[in-house]
Amino acid sequence: MASDSLPFEILLLSPCLLPGQTYFKESKASVKVEPQAGETILFFNIDDQSNPGCNLRQFLWGTETGQKICDLIVFYAKESERIICFVELKDNISDLGHGTKQVINTYNTFKGHLQKSYTAKAFIYACTGALPYEHEEYQRKLLKEFGKNNFDFNNRSNDALGDLLRGIPPKTGAGKRKNKK
């Protein structure tokens, strides 16, 4: 079963791991999780365009080009719970469709290398913009792949990613509101 652990060997033993960091910023968008007592949270920058030292893309797809990969994998553990969250950051939520493809494609390829002893989640965050008309279609795709309460997008709460990891439902109206005037 050595091949089952290989993705985590790549993540842990390469520049993919962001040691001691629970904050990540790409362009204008960022995410942060404040660890609580008893939690282990690891951030992995897996996008080889922003982190050329991470070889996860080559492991998952070899020399095949054009595959969509998300920005981060966040590993969360507390007591016996293990969560692997696939995270994509966008400057504008109009890119929600592309972000949805990135997290789903990364998850579907990644899960083929692991035993299902974890909960998979997805988080897509954009710092600006109104939800695209097709957002319900993307929501259905995420629901199909990750299940109810295992994904969130455009939730602008400061602790939205931490809440998702901990299983705390989104605050009322978060991620659903229109631009205020």
Go through the PLM ranges and name each one.
Residues 1-52:
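Charge-rich, low-complexity N-terminal segments
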Residues 2-13, 120-181:
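Domain-level recognition of nuclease-like catalytic cores that cleave nucleotide substrates
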Residues 79, 91, 129:
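Short, glycine/serine-rich, charged loops/turns that create anion-binding
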Residues 31-79:
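Active-site metal-binding core of divalent-cation-utilizing nuclease and nuclease-like domains
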Residues 72-74, 83-91:
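Conserved catalytic cores of phosphodiester-cleaving nucleases, focusing on short active-site segments
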Residues 94-130:
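Catalytic cores of nucleic-acid endonucleases
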Residues 78-81, 116-117:
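Flexible, charged surface loops at secondary-structure boundaries
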